[in-house]
UniProtKB/Swiss-Prot annotation:
Keywords: Amino-acid biosynthesis, Decarboxylase, Lyase, Lysine biosynthesis, Pyridoxal phosphate. Its EC number is 4.1.1.20. Homodimer. The active site is at C348 (proton donor). It comes from Aquifex aeolicus (strain VF5). It comes from the Bacteria. It catalyses: meso-2,6-diaminopimelate + H(+) = L-lysine + CO2. This is Diaminopimelate decarboxylase.
Length: 420
């Protein structure tokens, strides 16, 4: 029970049945079907408030990529969050969810001409520019629109964030940002482009960071650049230090709090007059979400035991591509014996699994499992692979339930291909 509270304080067993915010997960599965994503509203609110308390003067821009459900983005926007976006679709969504453009920052190495045009036209707070060529293209677009685009340059501090290599973004070999040693040249170049207004510096070193010491190394370099640019007369209004705080996936993981990060950086930032921007995503949304899946079949092949469920890599791809661990527990616990099994989905690939060689309480066909820490990069990375409709999503708060995404059907998948 105590372990569950470390994942989400609103998660508990009552008489052997799993509840979240007073709502039975079994009843949710029976009402809405499976696979089903379930989110805890109070958890999301508390995580956002933890950032606001730790960084009271900062702009907290939620990383929309983590989970783009409009209801969840709207919830955060109403709390005062801005949006960290990386695509035209995320710009559209953030505005649709009520987040004003003056609280939107736009990163990403491959912004298209249309995406840049729409964002300039929307007059967003800041473009986090990733290359000199992007500076040129953005300047040209802003000129055609008769506007000035506010920019920061994303600098790459060459810091190892000690995370999975696929989500380490602050090392020299990664595709992101400009070499921090070359940054002053890029700022001087940008200052000569008449349709750009330099307002900030941006840095983001990676995701799922549990050891926060690399943040200090990165921010030291960024603050040094800030001081140098300020001395040269640049008016740096915003220091965007990105996101990336990790969450508890494995039972033994120790999750850093926003206050831990604030304490680590306090002395570095105390003389910085620029407004700080942070871009949390996973650390707000990750443990707010659970994926419920139903056991379809049990299968033994010699000494190998398989639990085959209806959620696959199309619903939650993190285990397949990152070899990521998600804690999985029965929705109904009956103090049965433990078995060691591969928990696998229905997709026609050997790489379709939620867990391998996992010790878990013995379950039967038709029962439900809860996959924890599924609120970030879960539905957001889902697909229609094997022609499977994507899951429904519900939001729970203090015993109430709201359907926030309908389950897709086959017509939804094929309709864009018909009558062409």
């Amino acid at each position: 029970m105590e372990l569950l509270k470390e994942y989400n304080p609103y998660l508990e067993y009552r008489d052997g049945e799993l509840f979240i915010e007073g709502v039975s997960l079994k009843e949710l599965a029976q009402t809405f079907g499976t696979p089903l994503y379930v989110y805890s509203s109070n958890f999301i609110k508390e995580r956002f408030e933890a950032y606001r308390k730790a960084f009271p003067d900062a702009l907290i821009c939620y990383a929309v990529k983590a989970n783009f459900n409009p209801h969840l983005v709207k919830l955060l926007g109403e709390l005062g969050a801005g949006a960290d976006i990386v695509s035209g679709g995320e710009l559209y969504l953030a505005k649709k969810a009520g987040i004003p453009p003056e609280r939107i920052v736009y990163a990403g190495v491959g912004k298209t001409e249309k995406e840049l045009t729409d964002a300039v036209d929307s007059e967003i707070l800041m473009f986090n520019v990733e290359s000199r060529q992007e500076l040129d293209v953005l300047n040209e677009i802003a000129g055609k629109l008769g506007k000035k685009a506010r920019i920061a340059i994303r600098v790459n501090p060459d810091v190892d964030p000690k995370t999975h290599p696929y989500i380490a973004t602050g090392m020299q070999k990664s595709k992101f940002g400009v070499d921090i040693r070359e940054a002053q040249k890029e700022y001087e170049y940008a200052s000569k482009l008449e349709n750009l207004e330099i307002v900030g510096i941006h840095c983001h070193i990676g995701s799922q960071i549990l050891d926060i010491s690399p943040y200090r190394e990165a921010v030291e370099k960024v603050v040094s650049l800030y001081e140098s640019l300020t001395q040269k007369g640049f008016d740096i209004k915003y220091l965007d230090i990105g996101g990336g705080l990790g969450i508890k996936y494995k039972p033994e993981d120790k999750e850093p709090a926003p206050q831990d990060l604030a304490d680590l950086l306090k002395d570095l930032l105390e003389n910085v007059k620029a407004k700080i921007i942070l871009e949390p995503g996973r650390s707000i949304m990750g443990n707010a979400g659970i994926l419920i899946t139903q056991v379809q079949f049990l299968k033994d092949k010699g000494s190998k035991h398989f639990i085959i469920v209806d959620a696959g890599m199309n619903d939650l791809i993190r285990p397949s591509i990152y070899n990521a661990y998600h804690h999985i527990i029965p929705v109904e616990t009956k103090e049965r014996k433990k078995v060691v099994a591969d928990i696998v989905g229905p997709i026609c690939e050997t790489g379709d699994f939620l867990a391998l060689d996992r010790e878990i309480e013995e379950v039967q066909r038709g029962e439900y499992l809860a996959v924890l820490s599924a609120g970030a990069y879960g539905f957001a990375m889902s697909s229609h692979y094997n022609m499977r409709p994507r899951a429904a999503e519900v939001l729970v708060e203090n015993g109430s339930v709201k359907l926030i995404r309908k389950r897709e059907n086959y017509d939804y998948i094929v309709e864009p291909s018909l009558d062409i």
